Amino acid sequence: MRLVLVLFVFLLPVKGWGVSPEIFLHASRESGIPVELLLAISHVESRFNPHAINLSGRSVFPSSRVEAEGILKRSGDNVDVGLMQVNWGVWGRKLGVSKLDLLDSNLNVFLGAKILSQYVRARNGWWQGVGFYHSPTPERQREYVDRVWRSYSRILFRVRD
């Protein structure tokens, strides 16, 4: 019960975007990735903004889905989309989804969890998988893991209080 209450408090920004916290719980159950880790990654990647877009390294935070769709229609292949910032150029085609499909929060979190679980298995560890979720470059992995770890630790601290 405490975990649910903490997740609810931590996810108030998510609810503000009209996103159900249940998405993260469901994706966690389906993928085996701890819900706290999914939340930490989403926090680092998008600040829980389901419309967040990264265009070749430049973050954009549209205020609506309509605005996000317009940006995506004009974007190239190197674009990260949504709560989990799924890279369409790498994963969209492999998984058979469009850029606009990735704006669906349920699909985005589920795919992000699926991708992360593949990296965790391939790299034989949670944090190695987290680093690779972000980049194949070791230095970028270390920086990313540090950011996710800080967010993850804050979530765990709230859960344990």
Regions found by a protein language model. Give the residues of each.
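Sec-dependent N-terminal signal peptides
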Residues: 3-13
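Catalytic glycan-binding domains that act on GlcNAc-containing polysaccharides
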Residues: 17-161
